[in-house]
Amino acid sequence: MPDIKLFTGNATPELAKRISERLYLSLGDATVGRFSDGEIQVQINENVRGSDVFIIQSTCAPTNDNLMELIVMVDALRRASAGRITAVIPYFGYARQDRRVRSARVPITAKVVADFLSSVGVDRVLTCDLHAEQIQGFFDVPVDNVFGSPVLVHDMLKKIDMQNPIVVSPDIGGVVRARAIAKLLNDTDMAIIDKRRPRANVAQVMHIIGDVAGRDCILVDDMIDTGGTLCKAAEALKERGAKRVFAYATHAVFSGSAAKNLASDALDEVVVTDTIPLSPEIKALNKVRVLTLSGMLAEAIRRISNEESISAMFT
């Protein structure tokens, strides 16, 4: 194996530690802190000349701080003559700002971040479940977008006593993801929630396409933000006779009123991964369970370093 060095900022230190343990490596020695005026301070405290370096850092909240930590770390490592630098970004922030809706005067911030990373010297990006896969095209360097679905599906099959399960997409846009999950779950049935607002100033109506009565529903999505829509979807499923409702998502964004929303009785359990650390408020709910993607990300890092196929992990 080439001379691999792993570094991390302050966004996801626990995930970085798990990845390093899977690879039987120690995390690199780096100081990542703040100067007295709040500016980010980075110093690499070991030799990285010619090394294959991986920086593990989600750009979750505080998004701008974590993004700048990553950028400054890349620059420090580049100036220290690292051989190759891969940014391992388990959760890629700003991914939802990937287009101009109806030609509004707004930025395409996902493209700005991609340019930012390329300009400071990132050679490659490894990320997980991009909100929009076309964001890969915003980069001028190779991007490997791996999927959390195998880890989630393994949990669905092994850890929960599902009774007559059905996979549910919370919206039309998530149908492809839900179909892929359903296929991995022995081609189980699928349902779709079609959200519509009949006219202005009229409450949104949720139409459920599929029979969920008496069944365990598995709501799947790439991320959970405030959880408001998710809870409304769970309530609609229970009203249609669903026995239990489980929510599975890769990224636990959990912003705003998420803790209040997730406390809803309509949701029996929420299962996420460790791409984003949970806040104490969310942990206190005792309803959110966390799976680790460290094994999958460690294997992806090993394959990248050895110039092996990443897509073969999912075939």
UniProtKB/Swiss-Prot annotation:
UniProt entry keywords in alphabetical sequence: ATP-binding, Cytoplasm, Kinase, Magnesium, Metal-binding, Nucleotide biosynthesis, Nucleotide-binding, Transferase
Binding site for Mg(2+) 1: H131
Domain of life: Bacteria
GO cellular component: cytoplasm; ribose phosphate diphosphokinase complex
Cofactor binding notes: Binds 2 Mg(2+) ions per subunit.
Binding site for D-ribose 5-phosphate: R197, D221, D225, T226, G227, G228, T229
Enzyme Commission number: 2.7.6.1
Subcellular location(s) of the protein: Cytoplasm
Subunit-structure text: Homohexamer.
Organism per entry: Pasteurella multocida (strain Pm70)
Protein name, as recorded: Ribose-phosphate pyrophosphokinase
SMART domains according to UniProt: Pribosyltran_N (SM01400)
One Gene Ontology term from the biological process aspect of the record: ribonucleoside monophosphate biosynthetic process
Pathway(s) where this gene product acts: Metabolic intermediate biosynthesis; 5-phospho-alpha-D-ribose 1-diphosphate biosynthesis; 5-phospho-alpha-D-ribose 1-diphosphate from D-ribose 5-phosphate (route I): step 1/1
Role summary: Involved in the biosynthesis of the central metabolite phospho-alpha-D-ribosyl-1-pyrophosphate (PRPP) via the transfer of pyrophosphoryl group from ATP to 1-hydroxyl of ribose-5-phosphate (Rib-5-P).
Annotated binding of Mg(2+) 2, by residue: D171
Amino-acid positions noted as binding ATP in the UniProt annotation, renumbered to this chain: D37, G38, E39, R96, Q97
Membership in a protein family: Belongs to the ribose-phosphate pyrophosphokinase family. Class I subfamily.
Recorded catalytic activity of this chain's protein: D-ribose 5-phosphate + ATP = 5-phospho-alpha-D-ribose 1-diphosphate + AMP + H(+)
Keyword Metal-binding part of the UniProt annotation: yes
GO molecular function term, any single one: magnesium ion binding
InterPro entries on file: PRib_PP_synth_CS, Pribosyltran_N, PRibTrfase_dom, PRTase-like, Rib-P_diPkinase, Rib-P_diPkinase_bac
Cofactor requirements of the protein: Mg(2+)
Broadest EC class assigned to this enzyme: transferase
Gene3D superfamilies xref list: 3.40.50.2020
Active site residues of this protein: K195
